[in-house]
Amino acid sequence: MTDYKATLNLPDTAFPMKAGLPQREPQILQRWDSIGLYQKLREIGKDRPKFVLHDGPPYANGKIHIGHALNKILKDMIVRSKTLAGFDAPYVPGWDCHGLPIEHKVEVTHGKHLSADRTRELCREYAAEQIEGQKTEFIRLGVLGDWDNPYKTMNFANEAGEIRALAEMVKQGFVFKGLKPVNWCFDCGSALAEAEVEYADKKSQTIDVAFPVADETKLAAAFGLASLAKPAAIVIWTTTPWTIPANQALNIHPEFKYALVDTGERLLVLAEELVESCLKRYNLEGSIIATAQGSALELINFRHPFYDRLSPIYLADYVELGAGTGVVHSAPAYGEDDFVTCKRYGMVNDDILTPVQSNGVYVESLPFFGGQFIWKANPAIVEKLSEVGALMHTETISHSYMHCWRHKTPLIYRATAQWFVGMDKQPTTGEPLRERALKAIEDTKFVPAWGQARLHSMIANRPDWCISRQRNWGVPIPFFLHKQTGELHPRTVELMEQVAKRVEQEGIEAWFKLDAAELLGVEADQYDKITDTLDVWFDSGTTHWHVLRGSHDIGHTTGPVADLYLEGSDQHRGWFHSSLLTGCAIDNHAPYRELLTHGFTVDENGRKMSKSLGNTIEPEKVNNTLGADILRLWVSATDYSGEMAVSEQILQRSADAYRRIRNTARFLLSNLSGFDPARDLLAPEDMLALDRWAVDRTLLLQRELEEHYSEYRFWNVYSKVHNFCVQELGGFYLDIIKDRQYTTGANSVARRSCQTALYHISEALVRWIAPILAFTADEIWQYLPGERNESVMLNGWYQGLSELPEGTELDRAYWDRVMAVKASVNKELENQRTAKVIGGNLQAEVTLYADEGLSADLGKLGDELRFVLITSAASVVPFAQAPAEAVATEVEGLKLKVVKSGHAKCGRCWHFRADVGSHPEHPEICSRCVDNLSGSGEVRHYA
């Protein structure tokens, strides 16, 4: 028996079936580094239009987690796809380096006894060490960027750039000093930004407190009475007993009705709507003797329960009837609304009582409670209120309360002298900042679109931005204040530039060691040099200034400096927010054209990632077991606009999908064996009809994918590429061409046409997957035939695809109908295999009973229909001749019948044909194979 295997064009490639990504990816990284891939991209892109994705800096602390990996991979997919689309898309990674978490780490490691200078030195060392660790992890994910020259907010140039950005805002009149309640953490000893506040349940003691009336006559008149027959008091309700010593006013709503209630021993003023619930709470009976509009009670004085001072009634719209008494006690130093209302009524800063120190302890001079920590003083305050007869009721409740994101301890609002960026302050020219920012939001594209309303609401309702902190490890606010007037030095902007130049050379340490006389000369004795540092959100919020137009200078020169900012949804109140404010203050527009927001990672049950739950996924572990390309494929396959589920099981599914894509690539490469595009590539008009369709289908898909990439719809890219590999290629085209590819002459038109199509598909596919499967695409690139440059990334989308010409007889619609027929035939072949009527598809002969239109369509393929259906014989008969046993199909006008072939099997092509054995020299094969071996070779036109 002759072995005909050697006469076949069997697939052959060195491209490995087993990916071995954990071992192979580091080798590919080394190759990218050795060829200077990132630098080469900058060289070839210098004359291209620019696309700037600006990296929101992760904090330089700890190992990266799955959220970091998700974020960086998304950014990399965009940068790579924009590069392939013909843009110069530089990517400069960055790190946020200053701030409390690093200072806290240093204190924990080295103790709190350190000098400020030593603290800064150790913080700088710690941040540098953390950056190196994170950098290695990010590079391992395949993220392409300027890793040798990242930006760091602690680099001297960037620290100086922040000071210059602040100087611009000072010059334009946005910065002011004010006493104002800010989020205050006792453990940090500093104000916190809104983004550093989180909410958690807290148990609080609520109290209802009676404030005796001081103006009896006015109160009686307000209620339409000649006089008060009994002592009277107004009752407040609060969850913060510790603020009672700082009470300076009482707030009621101007439009609510208030009742004067006779409870027997005294009269109580309560919101009319809440009288019943209040009396029940106080275990009292009473009756309403008069009512008055809230506005009628304005400026009536009541007495503080245990201090000799008055508390006037101020009207305020923020008073609610949801709980309490309808009366709010006002401690302007410890409540934002209280502060605003008291200021509106003319209270000046010097009048505001601030008995709570930065560590949460009352000043020693405070009567009754001096020297006590506020949370521990609550019982003593309640006891004092009870002692003076002012306590109406007390109970403990659990409610959502603000906590420090770092220490997880409760915060308070605390009025301190801080530096602010004014939201509604009139600048030297143009509109106030809030107005500018809201307009800029309208000019920004949001992905997903709901981000616009969210950021708009935050900007519309936010208070002035407190930019000062009382910490060591931060960029200084280099101000000199006049000792008598408290005013900024008249040459502040000029002095800030002098400081910036020093910081550029020596870092922030230059300010802290500076002797004021070096800059002020004889004036130095008249000025205080302040030691406040900038909020870290100012550090990252001004990177558009000190990075994109400073240390790295890659931004656009007109309009927004960056095309895209991309971060998690929490950054609407973080980096997106601070960048918008600084951009609008300095340039009068946002620093970005587009904002993309991604959701947070959760496990497969929708639970947050938590070490305590044991459901975290470590990127390093995934890299070392499955490979970074699997993580990248998971990112691409998941709609990032909501929560993104990830688990070992989900990643395993991604690994399965990866194998299907890799196997498709391997099939393509193995069937390009012996193909040299310079020698063997056929022109479209010389190719077989099915091959031309395959190239046309590839072109149509590429157009779709380019659009999905440009709109950042990576999950659509993934699903379409995966379906193309599994269905249109694996389930249709690649199966059909095997016979032609393996059995026809090695240099025949039939085979070279097929290889030409496979080559075009491969060139397109390797580029499609390059932004997602960065490592695998570059690996495939090395195995493709023909001369090529060193990396797939040094190219654009493939331009060698051709469209089916207008008026082509076997057009797209035609092949869609053929695919539908083939699907129906496959279904019946499967049934016959299951029933053991046939062993394999080639053992089948199929008769298609088709209506006139379908019959004409199928007839166009002639004898080549059997190759499309992958059966040994296929015939088309009029639909009316279908016997009773013919099987109905889902295709209209089609029935079919499958029978087992009665012929012998060809030992070479495995078709069952009547002419097997008809050639005496080759008794084991069919005449078609004989012709392909020793004759002129078979001629194919269609498939």
From Swiss-Prot:
Question: What is one GO cellular-component annotation here?
Answer: cytosol
Map motif 'HIGH' region onto the chain.
58-68
Give the transmembrane region(s).
none
Asked whether the keyword Transcription regulation is assigned, the reply is no
For the ligand (L-isoleucyl-5'-AMP), the binding residues are 567
Q: Which cofactor does it need?
A: Zn(2+)
Single GO biological process annotation from the record: isoleucyl-tRNA aminoacylation
Main location as per UniProt: cytoplasm
The UniProt entry, under Gene3D superfamilies, shows: 1.10.730.20, HUPs, Valyl/Leucyl/Isoleucyl-tRNA synthetase, editing domain
Q: Which residues bind ATP?
A: 611
UniProt KW keywords: Aminoacyl-tRNA synthetase, ATP-binding, Cytoplasm, Ligase, Metal-binding, Nucleotide-binding, Protein biosynthesis, Zinc
PROSITE patterns, sorted = AA_TRNA_LIGASE_I
Specify one Pfam family.
tRNA-synt_1
Residues annotated to bind Zn(2+)? 906, 909, 926, 929
Q: Please provide the record's free-text comment about the domains of this protein.
A: IleRS has two distinct active sites: one for aminoacylation and one for editing. The misactivated valine is translocated from the active site to the editing site, which sterically excludes the correctly activated isoleucine. The single editing site contains two valyl binding pockets, one specific for each substrate (Val-AMP or Val-tRNA(Ile)).
Q: Which HAMAP family match?
A: Ile_tRNA_synth_type1
Quaternary state and partners of this protein?
Answer: Monomer.
Record's family?
Belongs to the class-I aminoacyl-tRNA synthetase family. IleS type 1 subfamily.
Physiological role? Catalyzes the attachment of isoleucine to tRNA(Ile). As IleRS can inadvertently accommodate and process structurally similar amino acids such as valine, to avoid such errors it has two additional distinct tRNA(Ile)-dependent editing activities. One activity is designated as 'pretransfer' editing and involves the hydrolysis of activated Val-AMP. The other activity is designated 'posttransfer' editing and involves deacylation of mischarged Val-tRNA(Ile).
Q: What is this protein called?
A: Isoleucine--tRNA ligase
Q: Which organism is it from?
A: Pseudomonas putida (strain GB-1)
Species lineage: Bacteria, Pseudomonadati, Pseudomonadota, Gammaproteobacteria, Pseudomonadales
